[in-house]
């Protein structure tokens, strides 16, 4: 446990162990992308391998279930893939938390800063009832935590309650966990 929050590595589950192996064996590393000095961890090979993808989805679904998810929030873009699969496995609905400009109006918008710029997330302002619902946010990577913190604010603005964050991997040294506050963070593979 890290600061009272589950890092994912405390779990002795078979699902978590399989997912860690899958991530270790299939993650591709790209130096100096998207900017000089950044090591990008590309999960494309993990997602493209059926067994590796299933292992990660199973571990994330287990964590989301433990967090009492009533609906899954998948972050643009790889969070859509993982979040949809987790929601399907758990028999839950999924909401796509989109980057700015991808949804028709009216929308609810939340601005935030990245480690290499700024951006915004959006949800539809109509047709989505999150009032009082327990939302677990799912994405591929925890870096600075800016995107996830913005997603939490967006969900809360729409009336939902974020009960946890579930990530495949974490990039160390960027303060991501600290930025997320006291909500549980489940990470399959901690920083390398």
Curated annotation (Swiss-Prot):
Keyword set includes Transferase: yes
Intracellular or extracellular location(s): Cytoplasm
Keyword Transferase: yes
GO MF annotation list: adenine binding; adenine phosphoribosyltransferase activity; AMP binding
Signal sequence, renumbered to the chain: none
GO cellular component: cytoplasm
A single BP term in Gene Ontology: AMP salvage
Pfam family, one: Pribosyltran
Catalysed transformations (reactions): AMP + diphosphate = 5-phospho-alpha-D-ribose 1-diphosphate + adenine
Pathway: Purine metabolism; AMP biosynthesis via salvage pathway; AMP from adenine: step 1/1
Root EC class: transferase
Chief location category: cytoplasm
Record's keyword terms, sorted: Cytoplasm, Glycosyltransferase, Purine salvage, Transferase
Cited SUPFAM superfamilies: PRTase-like
EC number: 2.4.2.7
Family membership noted in the UniProt record: Belongs to the purine/pyrimidine phosphoribosyltransferase family.
Subunit structure and binding partners: Homodimer.
NCBIfam families: PRK02304.1-3, PRK02304.1-5
Function of the protein: Catalyzes a salvage reaction resulting in the formation of AMP, that is energically less costly than de novo synthesis.
Name of the protein in question: Adenine phosphoribosyltransferase
Species this protein is from: Corynebacterium efficiens (strain DSM 44549 / YS-314 / AJ 12310 / JCM 11189 / NBRC 100395)
Organismal lineage: Bacteria, Bacillati, Actinomycetota, Actinomycetes, Mycobacteriales
Originating gene: apt
